[in-house]
Design a protein with these regions (language model features):
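Short, well-ordered secondary-structure "scaffold" segments embedded in the functional core
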Residues: 2-179
Length: 179
C-alpha cells in the first residue's frame, strides 16, 4: 500500500486506487512542464571543474527486472550520476540507469565525458581509466608511494563535497525510500 495515497484518498473521500490513477495521469504532464528547468549535460559550463559520483536511488523490488539489482548495494534501484561544483552546489543529475550499471559505464552513457573535458573533473576510484582526476588504487600485494598517498588525500579532501550534495539529495524521501 501507498500510505501517502491512502491519506490523500481519505482527505478527498475517494479510494486509494482513484488517487493512484490521477497520479499516473498527471505525473507525465508535470514532468513535461518541468523539463525546461532540468539541466542537461549540454547546460554545464565547459570551463568549470566538477566533482562526479554515482549513487543508487532505491526503487521497488521488481522480480521481473533483475537489471535493477545492484550487487554492490544488495538492493534494487537506479544508478544516478551526480555532478557538483567545487563550491558544493548541485550542477547536474544524469537520467537514471538500471542499478546494475557500473559508475564508469553510467558516466559514459550520460554523455558527460563527450560534452566536457574529462581531464578537468574529479571522481572516485570507480572512474579510473576515463581520464578524470581520481585517487590511485593500491597495487595488489603492495603499498602506495608517499606521493600517491598525498595525492589521494588531496583528492578525497575535495570529494567530500559531492558526498554532501548526494546526502542532501537523499533527504528527499523519494530518493532514499524503497517504495
Amino acid at each position: 500500500h501507498n500510505l501517502t495515497q491512502e491519506l490523500m484518498a481519505d482527505i478527498h473521500t475517494v479510494s486509494q486506487s482513484t488517487i493512484s490513477r490521477v497520479v499516473a495521469v498527471y505525473t507525465p504532464l508535470i514532468a513535461e512542464a518541468l523539463q525546461a528547468w532540468v539541466p542537461g549535460v549540454g547546460d554545464l559550463d565547459r570551463d568549470r571543474q566538477y566533482i562526479i559520483d554515482g549513487t543508487l536511488a532505491p526503487c521497488w523490488s521488481w522480480h521481473d527486472s533483475p537489471e535493477l539489482y545492484s550487487g554492490k548495494h544488495h538492493t534494487t534501484g537506479v544508478n544516478l550520476q551526480v555532478a557538483c561544483t567545487l563550491a558544493g552546489h548541485l550542477a547536474w543529475v544524469s537520467p537514471p540507469l538500471p542499478g546494475n550499471v557500473h559508475d564508469a559505464k553510467a558516466i559514459k552513457e550520460s554523455g558527460f565525458l563527450e560534452a566536457l573535458d574529462a581531464t578537468m573533473h574529479i571522481g572516485d576510484k570507480g572512474y579510473i581509466g576515463l581520464g578524470m582526476i581520481t585517487p590511485t588504487k593500491k597495487p595488489a600485494h603492495g603499498e602506495l608511494a608517499d606521493t600517491d598517498k598525498r595525492n589521494n588525500t588531496t583528492i578525497n579532501r575535495v570529494r567530500y563535497l559531492i558526498e554532501r550534495v548526494i546526502a542532501n539529495l537523499k533527504t528527499w524521501r523519494v530518493l532514499h525510500t524503497d517504495y
